[in-house]
């Protein structure tokens, strides 16, 4: 079954794997999902990710290693989609902070996928993909 919103699927797979206390989750590969995984590793929300392409599998996938705190709680307290295919949400250069700077907005900009802080520093706006805390 085709996925109409690959970013929402990415977010849901990570959220569900964290709720189930899984160490890893596999996500079908797209370049955007790989860039999002890279950003989440840089910001400390996931442990690591690996792109896996085998000859037996027709399609590559991303294996995401989730991160947990010392007491076993998922490092991501909240992750939710802001913009969707039916309702795009754009933010100009004056991007507000999420939860006073504790959380992040992830934006798709002309300079690539950036956090709200990076977009403010580079003075660019874009589509708000999701928020994470």
UniProtKB/Swiss-Prot annotation:
Gene Ontology BP terms: translation
Keyword check for Ribonucleoprotein: yes
Pfam families associated with the record: Ribosomal_S8
Keywords on record: Ribonucleoprotein, Ribosomal protein, RNA-binding, rRNA-binding
Superkingdom, natural source: Bacteria
GO cellular component: ribonucleoprotein complex; ribosome
A molecular function (GO) term: rRNA binding
HAMAP family (UniProt xref): Ribosomal_uS8_B
The family this protein is said to belong to: Belongs to the universal ribosomal protein uS8 family.
Subunit structure: Part of the 30S ribosomal subunit. Contacts proteins S5 and S12.
Its biological purpose: One of the primary rRNA binding proteins, it binds directly to 16S rRNA central domain where it helps coordinate assembly of the platform of the 30S subunit.
Name of this protein: Small ribosomal subunit protein uS8
